[in-house]
């Protein structure tokens, strides 16, 4: 799992 990509997706959804 690419955590950097996952975190980026979560941040995009959160914003």
UniProtKB/Swiss-Prot annotation:
Superkingdom of this protein's organism: Eukaryota
Keyword rRNA-binding: no
Post-translational events: The C-terminal amidation is required for full activity.
GO cellular component terms, A-Z: extracellular region
Residues modified to Lysine amide: 15
GO molecular function, one term: DNA binding
Biological process according to GO: defense response to bacterium
Coiled coil ranges: none
Tissue specificity remark: Expressed by the venom gland.
Keyword annotations of the record: Amidation, Antibiotic, Antimicrobial, DNA-binding, Secreted
Localization annotation: Secreted
Family membership: Belongs to the lasioglossin-like family.
Biological role: Antimicrobial peptide which assumes an amphiphilic alpha-helix conformation upon contact with membranes. Insertion into membranes involves Trp-3. Penetrates into cells once membrane has been permeated. Active against Gram-negative bacteria (E.coli (MIC=1.7 uM) and P.aeruginosa (MIC=15.8 uM)) and Gram-positive bacteria (S.aureus (MIC=14.3 uM) and B.subtilis (MIC=0.8 uM)). Has cytotoxic but no hemolytic activity. Binds DNA in vitro.
Protein name: Lasioglossin-1
Source organism of the structure: Lasioglossum laticeps
Lineage of source species: Eukaryota, Metazoa, Ecdysozoa, Arthropoda, Hexapoda
């Amino acid at each position: 799992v690419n955590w950097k990509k996952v975190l980026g997706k979560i941040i995009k959804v959160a914003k």
